[in-house]
A protein has these predicted regions:
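A short beta-strand element within the Helicase C-terminal
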Residues: 195, 200-218
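Conserved C-terminal RecA-like helicase domain
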Residues: 1-193
């Protein structure tokens, strides 16, 4: 109707209606072109994809999974990114740079007494964050693993509210090394919940003891 009716109308008011309708449809994720319609990125789709409610839903889900699986739970939370750079001005009042990302999911888990018991660890291509309850055990287990696997790395920590940022000093410290190390600690149960991005914990990554997978990606 927009293409064949309003746009072809001889009435200027119809052309204005077409422009308004196209603008509204685009905000809903539908783009009207010269030949038809197609899906497109939109403010609404971004709000839905990066909604804080997705992270908040982790708590009741993992609470129930932990009740059923007990100490044997091995949960993985996958997000699209560590934090988003896709927040545009018109929705900035609804989303911040952490919305929908791994850091937001990690902090959500730490905020609840039950999910905090899973001792979550966040791992991305640039960052390792560890629940403050787990830091000492994590460092001890990591240093032992590095010693056994020839990793000449010195680990340091930077404390934040509720968690610590773990850094490695040494030429061997890289995502390839620390993802392998953290995966093994996860398998052992040092941590029972990993939070990461699909780029690292997606296709090609394997941990045989996973029994809970929560996919927060937009795909």
């Amino acid at each position: 109707y927009i293409r064949h009716g309003l746009r072809r109308s001889e009435q200027p008011a119809d052309h204005e209606r077409a422009v308004k309708a196209i603008r509204i449809l685009r905000s809903l994720g539908v783009q009207v072109t010269e030949t038809g319609t197609q899906a497109c990125a939109s403010p609404m789709s971004r709000v839905m994809a990066y909604s804080k409610s997705k992270a908040e839903a982790l708590v009741p889900i993992l609470t129930e999974e932990q009740r059923v699986l007990g100490e044997g739970i091995r949960a993985v939370v996958i997000t699209d990114y560590e934090k988003t750079s896709a927040v545009i001005d018109e929705i900035r009042h609804l989303l911040d740079e952490e919305s929908g990302g791994a850091i937001a999911a990690f902090k959500q888990l730490l905020s609840d007494e039950v999910t905090d018991r899973l001792d979550p660890v966040l791992v991305t291509g640039s960052t390792v964050l560890v629940d403050d309850d787990l830091v000492e055990e994590f460092l001890a287990a990591s240093r032992q693993w590095l010693e056994e696997h020839g990793g000449d790395v010195e680990l340091t920590t930077e404390e934040h509210e509720g968690f610590s940022l773990v850094r490695g000093k040494g030429s061997n410290w890289s995502p390839r090394l620390y993802v392998r190390m953290i995966t093994e600690l996860f398998q052992q149960g040092v941590t029972r919940c990993l939070v990461g991005t699909r780029g690292l914990l997606g296709e090609g990554w394997d941990a045989s003891r996973i029994n809970v997978l929560l996919d927060l990606t937009a795909a």
